Amino acid sequence: ASTQRFQKRLDDYEENRHFLLSQYFRDNFNKSMSNLPVINSQFQIKRMEVWVTNRNGQTTNARDVVGLMDIGEPAPHKASYRTRPSGSTNINDQLPDNSANSLYSKLISNGTSRNPASVSSVLTMEGLRSAEDYERTFARKLTENEYFFNPQIGFLSLNIPLQPDEVLGVAFQYTYNGKVFQVGEFSENIALDQNKGVQQILFLKLLKATTQRTDLPIWDLMMKNVYSLDLFGQLQQQDFQLNILYEEPSAGLKRYLPVTSKAVEGKSLIKLLNLDRLNNRNDPQPDGVFDYVEGYTVLSKMGRVVFPLLEPFGDDLKNIAFKDIDSNVSKKYLYPQLYRNIKSEAQTYANLNRFVMEGQVKGSNGGAEISLNAFNVPPGSVSVRAGGQILKEGLDYMVDYGSGTVRIINPGILSSNIPVNVSFENNIGFGFQERGFRALRLDYMASKNFNFGFSSTRLSERPFFTKTNFGSDPIK
């Protein structure tokens, strides 16, 4: 294992990879994470299925699905589906469930809603719009080693980030105070249509659509507080250090904000953002060191850091550090655009992009290189897959065809902890040989009626490899 320093601007969160499972989990995320290692949550997710757009041609565990934005939401985006009282403080009125609004019951009561040929018409008649209220796609079910989920906080992390036009849908079942609730449908419960012999549509909770819309509720389900440390391999707690700094114009990087309310004056950013509440024995006593809590503030296998606040440089920082501070002053130190705009737009606010994460981390480079145990592999003959997905040469991996070595260069794949399979064409099976042919002809005319000549030929073969196939021995 090697120790390395890192520095990262905190506008560079990891998008299209980490998601909250419903608006309830978003509303309660900060509270649930506020007293680590004790979890302020009575949730326990027991089962989950994760479905993504089937881009790799998988035929098993693949089917037509419809992801619905409002399914399971007590306060649906389309108010016409609301059945629970608005603003209720009763926890039973806030919990996500298929019965939380009328959308799911309306769909399953329609006998044609599960037919792939008619489901789009059914959804249109309900007033639902594609890419906004729902997404229909042919999806594959991820295996359990292709993602991580926190069963108490209610967030999901994929091993490999989704492409912008890919769809993500889930079904999950959880308990709360001993009662069982479910959002979406599990594939084992919705089998083939026995009458027509076709696979029935599976209804899921939509977490990501084919387009990013900041005005829709699912925008808030994509987490913007998870950062990659760009490390090959897994994180190790030993010698791990992390600090949060503010780049003050003309003054450099500081551990403190230049201006805060008096109640938190003198507190470092790492404390303000609840990243330092514990000592090395996990007692609630800040010690100036990042709180390394596996599965909560750190995802070691993925090489990720999770902030315990959903908007650490937006509204959350405002509520913590700038109470009673004039908004004209506080807005100089806040970065709300990071959570209100798509990432590429938010990064254009250079005057607000002043937060930096730096420290040191120990990890392993193991697994970055794969030996093919062959030499002089034919160029272009190597195919690499991760979790069934075809990787791109030059983007995800590089090949030294002479030495027969594949090097994975995509840190997301290395840290994902999923199997990488390599197939290639081996020259050994072709008995490749070098051949040489030489010939000489000499003629001498002694007289008009007499001449004589001499001819010599030589054919030789030299195998490229010391071992040759039987019957293909080199000649000389």
Where are the regions that the model predicts?
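Surface-exposed, low-hydrophobicity segments enriched in Gly/Pro/acidic/Ser residues
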Residues: 1-476
